[in-house]
Structure formats: structure tokens, C-alpha cells
From Swiss-Prot:
This is Cytochrome f. PANTHER family: CYTOCHROME F, PTHR33288. GO terms for cellular component: plasma membrane-derived thylakoid membrane. It comes from Prochlorococcus marinus (strain MIT 9313). GO terms for molecular function: electron transfer activity; heme binding; iron ion binding. The lineage of its organism: Bacteria, Bacillati, Cyanobacteriota, Cyanophyceae, Synechococcales. It is found in: Cellular thylakoid membrane. Residues 1-23 form the signal peptide. Keywords: Electron transport, Heme, Iron, Membrane, Metal-binding, Photosynthesis, Signal, Thylakoid, Transmembrane, Transmembrane helix, Transport.
């Protein structure tokens, strides 16, 4: 039941965001939740890239090593130029929004809030985390969020403890990270969104351009063979053609309004055995003591030699 609570809350927040701002919300991680059991394909590609075709830089910061049963921060950085806007589904300009996915190794999960430091609480204010599914608590999602205030998203992570979970071993683990800014170009159904450049399907001459009541444009194109083709352009992209223009097949009819994109990367973290750390510290102490004793012994020998006149 406890695991269901975050999912139910996430669904509630998502539903409210769809009602309040449908244009900005439908391009985000819940599409992957609805259509894929695992957000990472066998090739290593995170499925968000199937809808967000533009590639953008995403960065991540995690500690080199962590101790068992400890809380650490995984920081996803989604850089872009401040005040960048995107087009909504009705064609209007809206602030760019961001989202992120962090795929942790088995056993790692979102840290309970009672273990968050004051610093983490401050850094995650206004951020709501959901797990990918009830069974995959090691896969965490965030978004959509206002981009200008969330170019860095902090994930508070709790490391597992091999002492209490026999399936966990000390060693190096991979973490897969994805970061997105802006809406996608393709819906899971395969349809194009209005966040695309639209091209002519065939060569011909533009014979008419009519505007619809919802901001869309209906372009009539007459081919050399006399066939008339209708191209419907949704609201948002700016037209690059006018009546009587001749176009080739594949020529752009509109600008490309997309200002976002998706990026992914892999990083690593070592689940460190504290016994090894204690052993290493003991080794350093022993070496330091040996060096000190060696210096003292050398000075003692020098004093004896000086007293004997050697």
C-alpha cells in the first residue's frame, strides 16, 4: 500500500497539470510509463528519445563512491538558454519545461524524506518524485517542471546495505540518466505533433493557403501531373511558402519551432565496503608510524655515532 501512495499522488498531480496546462504536460515521462515496461531498450537507448527526436546535452553528477545505507545526491543538469520558449499544442508560446529520469541499480531507491538533510530539502523544494512503476522503485521520474528554475534537478538517493540484503554486493554499479527540455515531435501513436517542421509530400505549385478557426493552415498543392494535394499545417510553425511558390518534394513548408531536446548518459557509483576503508586507514596509520619510528631510530643512531666520535 505504501508503494501505491506515490504513484496515486503522481497520477493526481499529472491529472491536474493536464487540466491546467495540457499543452505543456503531455510530452513528458508518463507516456513512457504507459507504453513501456522498461524505459531503457536493449540497445541502451532511453525510450524518451523515441518521441523527443532532437538531441541535447544532459549532464549528471554523482559521488564516486558511497557507503551502505547512506543518502547521497544524484544531480541531473539540463542546460539551455534562459527564457527560451516553446510552442504549446494550440500554437502559443509558453515557457520551456523540463523533465528527468534516473535509472538506479537494483536496491538503490529514493531516500525517505525523514532522512533528507536540510540542504536536500531546500534543493528539492517544489519537485515531486515518482517511481516508474510499483515494481521498479529504482527508476525515478521528475517533470514536467518550469525549466528556468529547475535546470539542475537533485535526486536524494538511499544506497542499499548488503548486511541486510543478501542480493546486494559491494562494487561498481551503473546509473543511467536522461534529461529533457521541451515537448516531443512524435506521439506514441506515431503521429507528428505541431512541434515539427512540415515538408511537402510531393513536388508542385502552391495554389491556395487558407487559415482554419483553430490556427491551422490548409495548403493546396498542384503537382505537374495535375493532381491536387492538401497539406494541413497545425497551429504553431511559421509558414515559409506563399501562393504560386514552386516546391520540391521534401522541401520545408514551415520553420522548425522546436527549441528543446533529449539527452542521456551513463555514469557509475561504487558501493564501498566500510571494512575496506577502515583497513585502508589502518594501513596508512601503520605506514605513518613506521616512517616516524624510522626517523626517530635514525636520529638515535646519529646521536650514538656523534657520541662515539664516528
Amino acid at each position: 500500500m505504501r508503494r501505491l501512495i506515490p504513484i496515486l499522488l503522481g497520477s493526481l498531480v499529472l491529472s491536474l497539470s493536464i487540466l491546467v496546462a495540457p499543452a505543456a504536460s503531455w510530452a513528458y515521462p508518463f507516456w513512457a510509463q504507459q507504453n513501456y515496461d522498461n524505459p531503457r531498450e536493449a540497445t541502451g537507448k532511453i525510450v524518451c528519445a523515441n518521441c523527443h527526436l532532437a538531441q541535447k546535452t544532459t549532464q549528471a553528477e554523482v559521488p564516486q563512491s558511497v557507503l551502505p545505507d547512506s543518502v547521497f545526491k544524484a544531480v541531473v543538469k539540463i542546460p539551455y538558454k534562459k527564457d527560451t520558449t516553446e510552442i504549446s499544442s494550440d500554437g502559443s508560446d509558453v515557457p520551456l519545461q523540463v523533465g528527468a529520469v534516473v535509472m538506479l541499480p537494483d536496491g538503490f531507491r529514493l531516500a525517505p524524506q525523514d532522512r533528507w538533510s536540510e540542504e536536500i530539502k531546500e534543493e528539492t523544494k517544489g519537485v515531486f518524485f515518482t517511481q516508474y512503476s510499483e515494481e521498479k522503485e529504482n527508476i525515478l521520474l521528475v517533470g514536467p517542471l518550469p525549466g528556468d528554475n529547475n535546470k539542475e534537478i537533485v535526486f536524494p538517493i538511499l544506497s542499499p546495505d548488503p548486511a541486510t540484503d543478501s542480493s546486494i554486493q559491494f562494487g561498481k554499479y551503473s546509473i543511467h540518466v536522461g534529461g529533457n527540455r521541451g515537448r516531443g515531435q512524435i506521439l506514441p501513436t506515431g503521429e507528428k505533433t505541431n512541434n515539427n517542421a512540415f515538408t511537402a509530400t510531393e513536388a508542385g505549385t502552391i495554389t491556395s493557403i487558407k487559415s482554419g478557426k483553430n490556427g491551422e493552415s490548409d495548403i493546396k498543392l498542384k503537382t505537374d501531373s495535375g493532381k491536387v494535394i492538401s497539406e494541413t499545417i497545425p497551429a504553431g510553425p511559421s509558414l515559409l511558402v506563399k501562393v504560386d511558390d514552386k516546391v520540391e518534394a521534401g522541401a520545408p513548408l514551415t520553420s522548425d519551432p522546436n527549441s528543446g531536446g533529449f539527452g542521456q548518459l551513463d555514469t557509475e557509483v561504487v558501493l564501498q565496503n566500510p571494512v575496506r576503508i577502515y583497513g585502508l586507514l589502518a594501513f596508512f596509520v601503520a605506514v605513518s608510524l613506521a616512517q616516524i619510528l624510522l626517523v626517530l631510530k635514525k636520529k638515535q643512531v646519529e646521536k650514538v655515532q656523534a657520541a662515539e666520535g664516528i
